[in-house]
């Protein structure tokens, strides 16, 4: 599987991902704007979360007035009792705008800097959709853009415009879809081991013992998470070359 162009050797659903979420960190290398692929995550999170995080895509929306701190619960800061911090976002973007102006020789405002990074993030999202649609012969203008995630509604219209799409589907619970999916997903523990040996009757006890050991490790992990022994099912798979 690949994540943001990086090949990962891990079990994964066939989903094309792009590093352009709300936590994607903003970079200026002296010549160009870049968004991601590294992320501030949820902790420390973007600068507006009041945990000392860097400027991220979410902060662009705060700077541009598309996220109003007054409409969010006071769950930010070290004690999770403060609202989003627009002041620190404005200060950081002002400093970044000065850096960009000094490097480019063209004076830009904090809002213009935020808008520039926003355009990069939207382009990254649109290009990811193009890769699995237009590049495979599909006309995306005939499809509906389905959005989810806490930041889905913030970027849906601009991504749709970039792709020439006319219709957007935004479910009322789109913001908690990932959490809902995790809540419904089976709890699993995966274990694997590579064994280089000839497949023969003599090797069977060793191979069976390895499977038993992996099963015990996986079962122990699930028991530690509070899963009842009666609810645990063990599946064994062997890939032979």
Model-derived segments and spans:
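N-terminally biased helix-coil "hinge/interface" segments that flank
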Residues: 1-241
């Amino acid at each position: 599987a690949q994540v943001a162009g990086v090949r990962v050797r891990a079990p994964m659903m066939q989903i094309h991902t792009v590093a352009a979420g709300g936590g994607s960190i903003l970079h200026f290398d002296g010549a160009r704007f870049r968004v991601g692929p590294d992320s501030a995550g949820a902790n420390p999170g973007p600068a507006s979360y009041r945990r000392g995080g860097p400027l991220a895509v979410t902060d662009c929306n705060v700077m541009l007035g598309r996220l109003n701190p007054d409409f969010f619960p006071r769950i930010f800061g070290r004690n999770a009792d403060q609202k989003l911090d627009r002041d620190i976002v404005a200060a950081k973007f002002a400093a970044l705008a000065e850096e960009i102006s000094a490097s480019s020789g063209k004076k830009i405002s904090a809002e213009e800097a935020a808008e520039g990074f926003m355009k990069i993030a939207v382009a990254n999202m649109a290009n990811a959709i193009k890769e699995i649609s237009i590049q495979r012969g599909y006309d995306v203008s005939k499809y509906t853009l389905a959005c989810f995630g806490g930041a889905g509604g913030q970027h849906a219209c601009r991504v749709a415009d970039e792709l020439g799409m006319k219709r957007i589907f935004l479910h009322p619970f789109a913001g908690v879809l990932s959490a809902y999916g995790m809540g419904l997903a089976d709890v699993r523990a995966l274990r694997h081991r590579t064994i280089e040996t000839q497949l023969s009757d003599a090797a069977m006890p060793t191979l069976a013992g390895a499977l038993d050991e992996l099963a015990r490790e996986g079962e122990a992990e699930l028991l530690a998470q509070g899963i009842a022994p009666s609810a645990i099912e063990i599946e064994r798979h062997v890939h032979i070359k």
